[in-house]
Amino acid sequence: MHGLDDAQYLQQKAHNKRISEFRSSSNSGINVTVVLKYTNGVVQVYNWQGTEVIAGSLNRQLMKFPNYMNPDKHGRIEWPGEGVEHQHGLIRSNGGNGSYDIGAGDPYAMQFIVQGSVDWNATRLRFFGPDGSRWMPDDQGGASVRAGLLNAAEDIINSKMQPLYFCDRMAGKSYYVRFDDKYAPRFPTIGFEVYRYRVGATNEMGGESARTAVASLISFPTFSTAYVNEKVAVENFFQPRELVYQNSYGYTV
């Protein structure tokens, strides 16, 4: 016997089938560049390659991240993604109401640049806690988030997910993710997966999977890596005219 109830067994069997399909697909080999952009202009760049589809964790202690925030009198801070980009629709929030709010206490942003044969128009991110569960507490909308993460792509981020946001940029070629450091003591580890959604995806709880996994970052470099200058990082890792945004430091890529 497999030791699982029928529903668990079928779910695990379907999961194994998706992994097998993914590993034999043309999307199985990808490169991921992770850029940590601090609000003081410092950038850290990491690269990752792989084909494994394993729900790993970043194993980063969020409380170790310095908080460079300088909120204004309204408790807001400038963040890449506001202003010009928002007005021109280069960034689309999945908050449900078409907008998002950036609050004080945001320690850092992550930018994910994924390169490879991926369906960019249907790529999203999914977040996990240390034990593989959704990391939002129930009293902060965690139950809604756990349900929302099982829905189709457009329903993944709902307006209750204040501690994090992500957005599309330029047909999905990169992502900004913001974490609120007030949750750091309770949720010291964050794992994430990058998913490709099938066209016409429906609620996964209905039985048929709505997702095909593209990649999981199953390991992550330590943050002892030397900082790099933001301008150097931008010149090295962004293609002008492909990724266009104006950040809070005054120049446009």
Swiss-Prot record:
One GO location term (cellular component): viral occlusion body
Keywords, alphabetical: Viral occlusion body
Function description: Major component of the virus occlusion bodies, which are large proteinaceous structures (polyhedra), that protect the virus from the outside environment for extended periods until they are ingested by insect larvae.
Official protein name in the record: Polyhedrin
